[in-house]
Regions:
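Conserved active-site and cofactor/substrate-binding residues in soluble primary-metabolism enzymes
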Residues: 1, 15, 19-22, 26, ...
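Adenosine-phosphate binding glycine-rich loop
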Residues: 2-23, 218, 331-445
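Flexible, glycine/charged-enriched surface loops at secondary-structure junctions
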Residues: 21, 37-44, 117, 154-163, ...
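Rossmann-like adenosine-cofactor binding region
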Residues: 262-363, 368
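Glycine/serine-rich phosphate-binding loop and adjoining beta1-alpha1 elements at the start
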Residues: 94, 113-227
Length: 445
């Protein structure tokens, strides 16, 4: 496979879509040698089909603000790949949303979902609408307008959206209510729902919980115990909250969280009421972490910087894509970090990843580490289909088993001759093989 030529052709077809092209290139680097061993894949143009979404739905979303003025946003749903199940992936409401970001997320989601072993294809959607600064009534009207178009493209056996950045339980509730109103159908068409109407226990914290289960497996395989380790976390939303909660439960000490305004360093550890306060910060809608240092005087707020300059044992990006760059990676390496686990999607830049792998560090990508969120969404789908509700202990046990299985697949496909586990290659190859076999079995569709 000529990766450079393939990427040139793809970029000519999709100019300017940097996030999407970055995600494709990263996977190609991992699977090129395996692809070359299967001439039947090349004859079937498997790769050319795999990197293109099956369907992209774009639509306008008109809604009325509290002043009576009509606002118009753009809505998207990228139905990327359904080879192993109905499209599954979140909805993101944020001003930065564009087609490149959603295509990258849908592409990554395809392999992430394959790693869970659950029957879920890959998809992603959202809008350039930001809930920040909007009233509940405005958010409700936007969600209702968004679903008025989206409903005709989704269903429990077709496409099952969930939440993501800017889409929490409130937004999922408004979206589900409008879907039910339009279709007169009460089904598991969305995940991340409230418990009162079909949600699953553990779902809000599942991405963070699953990430820590995976990181613990990484450390244990390398002869380390997570207990007593210091942890840097970025972000302060559901993912960061879940990660901080589970890290503390496992005996680690979380010392940072962050927001758009900077980061908090708390040498005493972020636990107990401090973790609860993260929820208050998020609920305030201000999208800042500085008030944490006022609430807990022992902590320090560092304005305009990322937490990767802090000396820690474990670094967990939990905020957004490309939040940890090459310079940040060098800071972590110089400070002797043991392990980096992406809990955000594509949280590290290619330069950062190259540095981690060159130093033979414990590093694992988001498609493996953060798969706990979509895995628990899959468990929510199962509960909805059976009209059952499992206990928190049962869901957590299943989540733990799934993350153990993902780690095992990464080790199986990513172990190099010297014993180093390249988790990037392992995750990409394991996910790709399952999707590739399914696509070949289903013909040219």
């Amino acid at each position: 496979m000529n990766i450079e030529l393939f990427m040139q052709q793809l970029e000519a077809r999709h100019p300017g879509e940097k996030e999407y092209l970055q995600a494709v290139h990263e996977v190609l680097l991992s699977i090129a040698d395996i692809y070359d061993q299967h001439p039947e894949w090349e004859r079937a143009s498997l790769l050319e089909r795999l990197v293109e979404p099956e369907r992209i739905i774009t639509f306008r979303v008109p809604w009325v603000d509290d002043k009576g003025k009509v606002q118009v946003n753009i809505g998207y749903r990228v139905q990327f790949n359904s080879a192993i199940g109905p499209y599954k992936g979140g909805l993101r409401f944020h001003a930065s949303v564009n087609l490149s970001i959603l295509k990258f997320l849908g592409f990554e989601q395809t392999f992430k979902n394959a790693l869970t072993t659950l029957p879920m294809g890959g998809g992603k959607g959202g809008s350039d609408f930001s809930p920040r600064g909007k009233s509940d009534a405005e958010i409700m009207r936007f969600c209702q307008s968004f679903m008025t178009e989206l409903y005709r493209h989704i269903g429990p056996e077709v496409d099952v959206p969930a939440g993501d950045i800017g889409v929490g339980a409130r937004e999922i509730g408004y979206l589900f209510g409008q879907y039910k109103r339009l279709t007169r159908d009460f089904s598991g068409v969305l995940t991340g729902k409230n418990l009162e109407f079909g949600g699953s226990l553990i779902r809000p914290e599942a991405t963070g919980f699953g990430g820590l289960y995976f990181v613990r497996e990484m450390l244990e395989r390398a002869g380390h115990d997570i207990k007593g380790k210091t942890v840097a976390i970025s972000g302060f939303g559901n993912v960061a909250w879940g990660a901080a909660t589970k890290a503390t439960q496992l005996g680690a000490k979380v010392v940072t969280i962050s927001g758009p305004d900077g980061y908090i360093y708390d040498p005493d550890g972020i636990s107990g009421e401090k973790i609860d306060y993260m929820l208050e910060l998020r609920a305030s809608g201000n999208d800042i972490v500085a008030p944490y240092a006022e609430e807990f005087p022992g902590a320090q707020f560092v304005e305009g910087k990322h937490p990767w300059e802090v000396k820690v044992d474990v670094a967990l990006p939990c905020a957004t894509q490309n939040e940890l760059d090459g310079n940040d990676a060098q800071h972590l390496i110089d400070n002797g970090v043991l392990c980096v686990g992406e809990i955000s999607n594509m949280g590290c830049t290619p330069e950062a990843i190259d540095k981690f792998i060159a130093h033979k560090m414990l590093y694992a990508p988001g498609k493996a580490v953060n798969a706990g969120g979509v895995a628990t969404s899959g468990l929510e789908m199962s509960q909805n289909a059976m009209h059952l509700s499992w206990s928190a202990e049962d869901v957590d046990k299943r989540l733990h088993q799934i993350m153990h299985g993902i780690h095992r697949q990464c080790v199986e496909h990513g172990t190099e001759a010297d014993g180093y586990v390249n988790y990037v290659r392992g995750a990409n190859v394991a996910g790709f093989m399952k999707v590739a076999k399914a696509m070949m079995a289903q013909g040219v569709v």
